[in-house]
Each structure stands twice: as structure tokens, then as C-alpha cells.
């Protein structure tokens, strides 16, 4: 069985849908952050697949930049969640309604 571009795009779409469903359905900020990372990894998978099957390495280079930005996003996101937890003692998205501490 030959694994083609369609298989990778379908897998990427499924991962993206799982991440989107997690963001919509869950209310915990840490879970929302993890689901956002799943969505970014789905986009990375699609970029690498298109890059591989079109014999162009620019998509793979772009993935390295996306991974770098995602790592910075996780660091800032977790720092914000920890700061909010110290003040509000919760990580539920609906409990955090004020824009300032």
C-alpha cells in the first residue's frame, strides 16, 4: 500500500479537528493551550507533506520557524496561566472574566 499525500492531509485534518473540538468543548486553560498546540502540529504535518511531495524544502524550513514560535507561545501561555492561577486560584476559562489582576 502506497501512502500518498491524501493520507497525510487527512491525518492533518483529523488532528486539526481534534484540536478545534478541544478548544470549543473544554474550558480549562491548560487543555485549551494543549489543543492549540495540536492544531499547530496538524498545520506542520500538512506543510511537511506538501513540501515532501512537491520536492520543495521551503515548507520544511517554515515548520522549524513554526515550532520555534510555538515553543515561545507555550512558554508565555504557561507563564500567564501560572500568574492567573496565583491570583484567581483557578484555571477555568469562564472564571477569568477580568482583564486585570
From Swiss-Prot:
Gene3D superfamilies: 1.10.287.3510. The gene is nuoK. InterPro entries: NADH_UbQ_OxRdtase_chain4L/K (IPR001133), NUOK/Mnh_C1-like (IPR039428). The keyword Transmembrane applies. It is an enzyme of class 7 (translocase). This is NADH-quinone oxidoreductase subunit K. It catalyses: a quinone + NADH + 5 H(+)(in) = a quinol + NAD(+) + 4 H(+)(out). Coiled coil: none annotated. It holds the Pfam family Oxidored_q2. It is a multi-pass membrane protein. One of its GO terms (molecular function) is quinone binding. Keywords: Cell inner membrane, Cell membrane, Membrane, NAD, Quinone, Translocase, Transmembrane, Transmembrane helix, Transport, Ubiquinone. GO terms for cellular component: NADH dehydrogenase complex; plasma membrane.
Amino acid at each position: 500500500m502506497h501512502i500518498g499525500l491524501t493520507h497525510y492531509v487527512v491525518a492533518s485534518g483529523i488532528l486539526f479537528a481534534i484540536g478545534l473540538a478541544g478548544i470549543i468543548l473544554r474550558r480549562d486553560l491548560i487543555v485549551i493551550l494543549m489543543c492549540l498546540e495540536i492544531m499547530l502540529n496538524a498545520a506542520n504535518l500538512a506543510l511537511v507533506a506538501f513540501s515532501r511531495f512537491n520536492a520543495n524544502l521551503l515548507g520544511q524550513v517554515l515548520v522549524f520557524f513554526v515550532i520555534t514560535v510555538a515553543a515561545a507561545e507555550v512558554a508565555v501561555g504557561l507563564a500567564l496561566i501560572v500568574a492567573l492561577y496565583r491570583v484567581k486560584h483557578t484555571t477555568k476559562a469562564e472564571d477569568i472574566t477580568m482583564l486585570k489582576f
